[in-house]
Amino acid sequence: KDGKENGQGTHIWTNGNKYVGEFKDSKKHGQGTTTFHDDGTTYIGEFKDDEMHGQGTNTYANGDQYVGEFKDGKKHGQGTFTWTDGDKYVGEFKDDLKHGQGTYTMANGTVGKGIWENDELVEPN
């Protein structure tokens, strides 16, 4: 419509990055999957205006994984980040950082629980 991509489709960029999913006005919008060619990172979930937005799963090339909410392309809201070394954080994120109520459990069993601000535990409980 008007020369813009709308509906289901696939777009492969010259750098090898690939998106399969819904488009609105030539932007990623709705459900889709993006694969980044340079390192194999994938995102499966919701998009809005070309950005990860809503519920999704981001699996990084090294195996780390985030499952949860995104806003404007960043981890934002409730989510779980699991590192390949066995560490796990379950809680709130803001602008890609641990921020709000959350629990960080290390692979060795050590637990940090409480209020987080800008990736730091500031009020343990």
Language model: regions and residue ranges:
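Conserved anchor residues at repeat-unit boundaries in beta-strand-based tandem repeats, strongest
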Residues: 1-6, 18-29, 42-53, 65-76, ...
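Threonine-centered tandem repeat motifs in low-complexity domains
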Residues: 5, 10-14, 33-35, 57-61, ...
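Short, solvent-exposed mixed-charge patches
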Residues: 123-125
